[in-house]
């Protein structure tokens, strides 16, 4: 029965849909918005000093919702200054959505957008193969994308080397205190692994940055994901959330019954979720890691 399970990443359409359901059922973007409102202005306070243009690199920009939040904060900090925003994103579908979002968003006049349909590894390879030195950036952000990188230390070292003076990297990924950390550690070996994705949290990232000798600050914010529908048999929304939780395509239909029963039981335990007003809210806490350029 276990052999019937396959990685969610083997079906791009279902992955995108399950990710959309995750966003609709979680406070992920609200949590990010809170960080952008309260913390980001201080973080970007010096990135554009005495510059005619601010260069921003979005690695794994997705459909652009969070990117545009970031850009609005940069615009507010540096009114009238031109912004060059380059996006590295492997999904053609997400790039189309990103472009549609830009087209219907006002106050984008001083921002130049360019998109590259490639992974961060492909971007890195392309930059290293070009004869000229790779461009330097004033702000690089990597939002919920390090799970899809094979060599995280090498990736961090490469992008850290692209920072201009006073520049920063913002990395967002799940916290080491989240339910994801516990779920992956307990069940990862029993779920279909894909070399496209690896289990990594802020705890792992902090260790990697320490080993590289790179300075950083880490902020944790509370986020939840409503997984109540996962406990309703045959619920379409619940089935897609199951897929996202386990990174397994059609998990509800293909997983061994004992595995699903075990995970279902655990997901209701306090170390994974809280129960509130009849809902089961999975711990989706996020970490925001700010990496500084070398002085």
Swiss-Prot record:
Location of the protein in the cell: Cytoplasm
InterPro entries found in the cross-reference section: HHMT-like, SAM-dependent_MTases_sf
Catalytic activity: histamine + S-adenosyl-L-methionine = N(tau)-methylhistamine + S-adenosyl-L-homocysteine + H(+)
EC number: 2.1.1.8
Biological processes per GO annotation: histamine catabolic process; hyperosmotic response; methylation; response to amine; response to cocaine; response to glucocorticoid; response to immobilization stress; response to interleukin-1
Keywords: Cytoplasm, Methyltransferase, S-adenosyl-L-methionine, Transferase
Pfam families the UniProt entry points to: Methyltransf_23
Family annotation (SUPFAM superfamilies): S-adenosyl-L-methionine-dependent methyltransferases
GO cellular component labels: centrosome; cytoplasm; cytosol; nucleoplasm
Keyword Electron transport belongs to the record: no
Entry superkingdom: Eukaryota
UniProt binding sites for S-adenosyl-L-methionine: 60, 89, 94, 120, 143
Binding site for substrate: 28, 284
Keyword Phosphoprotein among UniProt keywords: no
GO molecular function, one term: histamine N-methyltransferase activity
Quaternary context: Monomer.
Record family assignment: Belongs to the class I-like SAM-binding methyltransferase superfamily. HNMT family.
Function, as annotated: Inactivates histamine by N-methylation. Plays an important role in degrading histamine and in regulating the airway response to histamine.
Protein name according to UniProt: Histamine N-methyltransferase
Gene: Hnmt
């Amino acid at each position: 029965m276990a052999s019937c399970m396959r990685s969610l990443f083997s079906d791009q359409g279902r992955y995108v849909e399950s990710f959309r359901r995750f966003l609709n059922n979680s406070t992920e973007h609200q949590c990010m918005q809170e960080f952008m409102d309260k913390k980001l202005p201080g973080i970007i306070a010096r990135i554009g000093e005495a510059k005619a243009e601010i260069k921003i690199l979005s690695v794994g920009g997705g459909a652009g919702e969070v990117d545009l939040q970031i850009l609005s904060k940069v615009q507010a900090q540096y009114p009238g200054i031109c912004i060059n925003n380059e996006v590295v994103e492997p999904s053609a579908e997400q790039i189309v959505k990103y472009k549609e979002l830009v087209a219907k968003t006002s106050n984008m006049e001083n921002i130049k957008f360019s998109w590259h349909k490639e992974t961060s590894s492909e971007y890195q390879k392309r930059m290293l193969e070009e004869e000229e030195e790779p461009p330097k950036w004033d702000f690089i952000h990597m939002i919920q994308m390090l799970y899809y990188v094979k060599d995280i230390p090498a990736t961090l070292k490469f992008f850290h080397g692209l920072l201009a003076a006073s520049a920063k990297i913002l990395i967002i990924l799940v916290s080491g205190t989240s339910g994801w950390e516990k779920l992956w550690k307990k069940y990862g070996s029993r779920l279909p692994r894909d070399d496209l994705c690896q289990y990594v949290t802020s705890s792992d990232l902090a260790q990697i940055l320490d080993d590289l000798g790179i300075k950083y600050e880490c902020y944790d914010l509370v986020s939840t994901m409503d997984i109540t529908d996962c406990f309703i048999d045959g619920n379409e929304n619940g089935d897609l959330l199951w897929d996202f939780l386990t990174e397994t395509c059609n998990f509800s239909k293909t997983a061994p019954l004992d595995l699903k029963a075990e995970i279902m039981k655990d997901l209701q335990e306090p170390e994974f979720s809280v129960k509130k007003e009849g809902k089961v809210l999975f711990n989706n806490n996020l970490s925001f890691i700010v990496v500084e350029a070398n002085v």
